[in-house]
A protein has these predicted regions:
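Basic nucleic-acid-binding interfaces
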Residues: 2-36, 47-79
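Minor-groove-contacting beta-hairpin "wing" of winged helix-turn-helix DNA-binding domains
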Residues: 41-45
């Protein structure tokens, strides 16, 4: 969990140049469900948060998607 928290803070400070595997590792550490339905996106959901977030699985992940993921993790932590 500590490593995931450090990675999350690094994402918050610099949303550039992250891989989808990094987002998945942080999500799993915080108990967030990760779905790869076979398309080009990865879906992150959590039962206590109404809306999930979808991130394109191709690289590079645009900073807007990384920021949306960080906001989603923050909502999960507050719920």
């Amino acid at each position: 969990m500590r490593r995931a928290a450090k990675t999350l803070e690094a994402m918050r400070a610099n949303p550039l140049d992250w891989r989808i595997e990094d987002l998945e590792a942080v999500a799993r550490a915080f108990g967030i469900n990760v779905r790869r339905p076979g398309g080009s996106h990865v879906y992150f959901t959590h039962p206590r948060v109404r809306e999930g977030v979808s991130v394109p699985a191709r690289r590079p992940i645009k900073p807007a998607y990384v920021r949306a993921f960080v906001r989603f993790v923050d909502r999960v932590r507050q719920a």
